[in-house]
């Protein structure tokens, strides 16, 4: 998985994509995968993330609140609270096409 996150970070730095937040977006996807217990980025993992995208972005959803608690315990809540996970998903789905 470390290789995937490194490649995703590099993708976020490429001209035309250049998110300006490559490291933060790679971390955001890593932390989301940790929460979802996704150990390999494959079709199943991508589909799982895609199916939960609305709940991940909805502050009123049970999943959002549970993810926020998970990240808070790990000292990483800003990745969700400040919108890094939501923003990273756009780049993630483009990257895994």
Regions found by a protein language model. Give the residues of each.
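Non-catalytic DNA-binding core/recognition domains of DNA-processing enzymes
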Residues: 17-97
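Short terminal alpha-helical segments
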Residues: 1-21, 25
């Amino acid at each position: 998985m470390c290789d995937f996150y490194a490649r995703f970070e590099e993708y976020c730095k490429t001209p035309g994509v250049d998110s300006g937040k490559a490291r933060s977006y790679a971390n955001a996807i890593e932390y989301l995968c940790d929460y979802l217990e996704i150990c390999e980025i494959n079709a199943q993992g991508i589909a799982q993330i895609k199916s939960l995208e609305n709940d991940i972005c909805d502050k009123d959803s049970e999943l959002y609140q549970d993810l926020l608690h998970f990240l808070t315990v790990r000292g990483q809540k800003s990745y969700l609270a400040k919108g890094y996970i939501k923003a990273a998903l756009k780049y993630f789905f483009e990257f895994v096409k």
